[in-house]
Amino acid sequence: MLKVTNVHKAFGKNEILKGVDLTVDKGDVVVILGPSGSGKTTLLRTIDFLETADQGELEFDDIKTSLSHAHKNTILNVRRKTGFVYQNYNLFANKTALENVMEGLVTARKVPKDLALEIAEHALKKVGLLDRKDFYPSQLSGGQQQRVGIA
């Protein structure tokens, strides 16, 4: 289970997140919808420690920590166990679909390259893109790029 409570984040005087609570049970897929500028991406970036919250708590598996001052090892543990799909796909333009999927496995999760290759090919097969593994993002449709991000 992932649970965040009382998350606050401001940029200057502009409060983006004001006491946000969110609970996601294991295995759930969640879509966060809202108008532009409502804080959707900021919330996800805060949960993944890409932004520092002004206040808030996170519980995930056996981890309990503050979103405003978490230890580096805690941050790495959370990132290794979570995945987010953003509206923009954040693929590396100079890497193939296969290389993009492998990148996170090798760098963030420290998976050996030979195993990462096997996992990445399996993931691309699951999203129907194994036949496009050697294509660069510019050669893929928007939907295909998003599926690479999911893989």
Task: Show where each model-derived region lies.
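ABC family nucleotide-binding domain
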Residues: 1-151
